[in-house]
Amino acid sequence: MTNMIDPHLLLSAYATGIFPMSDSRETDEVYWVEPKKRGILPPDHFHLSRSLAKIIRSDRFLVTADRDFEAVIDLCAEPTEDRPDSWINPPIRAAYCQLHNLGYAHSIECWLDNRLVGGLYGVNLGYAFFGESMFSRVSNASKVALAWLVARLKVGNFSLLDCQFITDHLASMGAIEITREDYLKRLKSAVSSYFTDKETGNWNTLDRLSPLLHNKHSKTKENQFADADLPFTEGIALETDGTAPGEASFSLACPNGARIVQLLGQIS
């Protein structure tokens, strides 16, 4: 048990298939978990339903990356009707916020009417992304966030999306359950080159892709961004490529929903 998590220890734990949890958001105690069965979602086997594809193409949500990591983790930790407590306690929150500041933890945000209504966060190490938690305050927001995450991982050459535990929700979108032995083989393949040559998947590749401009039902990200009065826009001096100095890339011409559907491939 410990109430402090060193970021280097946390990354080393991920590299060996272990991650932290707690029994309650009200405690400072943390324990380490190594499941006998592991949930993963192979990026090339994401199940995109026709209904979800339609929602994504409509660009109902403005989807961003790394724009409000702390808000995402706080909303993931909030109790809900289905989940009255959370394992995201103060030491775990602090550890992942520190990883985010170091460039290892990332978030996906879904905005609707200027409100953060869905999202997820996780850890990037090598060619692996370890999904930690997601939330949704309106229907389909977390599904849209996951779809955008998978598209980002595909174009960034990631090979492993770790879901930790399988759920019916994740299984419906392509997640599978594998043995610990199988998982460790995949994990080694995904992270070993990081420790030898610092090779890693490219989190920002997606932001450099242009939207499908022929989609008449979609607003471009440039127009969405200009029209939106979002918390992260205040005080941000955008450079010519749409990147805020010192922050993760967010191009004004990054993909719209039509391009995300195209990147995800076959609709099931």
UniProtKB/Swiss-Prot annotation:
Its main location: cytoplasm. Keywords: Acyltransferase, Cytoplasm, Transferase. The keyword Metal-binding does not apply. Pfam families: Leu_Phe_trans. It catalyses: N-terminal L-lysyl-[protein] + L-leucyl-tRNA(Leu) = N-terminal L-leucyl-L-lysyl-[protein] + tRNA(Leu) + H(+); N-terminal L-arginyl-[protein] + L-leucyl-tRNA(Leu) = N-terminal L-leucyl-L-arginyl-[protein] + tRNA(Leu) + H(+); L-phenylalanyl-tRNA(Phe) + an N-terminal L-alpha-aminoacyl-[protein] = an N-terminal L-phenylalanyl-L-alpha-aminoacyl-[protein] + tRNA(Phe). Coiled coil: none annotated. This is Leucyl/phenylalanyl-tRNA--protein transferase. Functions in the N-end rule pathway of protein degradation where it conjugates Leu, Phe and, less efficiently, Met from aminoacyl-tRNAs to the N-termini of proteins containing an N-terminal arginine or lysine. One of its GO terms (molecular function) is leucyl-tRNA--protein transferase activity. One of its GO terms (biological process) is protein catabolic process. InterPro entries: Acyl_CoA_acyltransferase, Leu/Phe-tRNA_Trfase, Leu/Phe-tRNA_Trfase_C. It is found in: Cytoplasm. It is an enzyme of class 2 (transferase). Belongs to the L/F-transferase family. Its EC number is 2.3.2.6. GO terms for cellular component: cytoplasm. The keyword Nucleotide-binding does not apply.
